[in-house]
């Protein structure tokens, strides 16, 4: 949408989007919005506030702008509508950029614990990173207040801590090799033209 030549006010729209990147609404208005929408203590409270990133939107925009307009025009002449052009031309040509955006979102969401600590009250719904944070904090606090009789439990606490760190790191380590071939290409395509 923002890469097309015939869109009026596209520079103004981009300025508004970039403005939100530098000056966000803040934590309290976001919390009040999530609470008033009835999303508090649901998984959607963690997903929706971070669903669209301005930085990733700019990368996608520059990636789509690098696709030649001749393909768009040729598909229109052949009778394709906007949905067909998007799904059969733009998406296949943007696999590298989509893989990079997927990796950015995956790593960012996987490592996020702060939003979950604000929006989730039920311990059953805590994500792994928040559970890991609680394990690390409780283990650190337990080692500070323990006396000689607790030395046996310190080894168990350290084992649990390191096992939780491995479990939290493993999914990203498994996914990254499959996306790595797209990663460098997608980052370069998204940064060259703009």
Question: Where would I find each of the regions flagged by the language model?
Answer:
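A hydrophobic, multi-pass inner-membrane permease signature
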Residues: 1-194
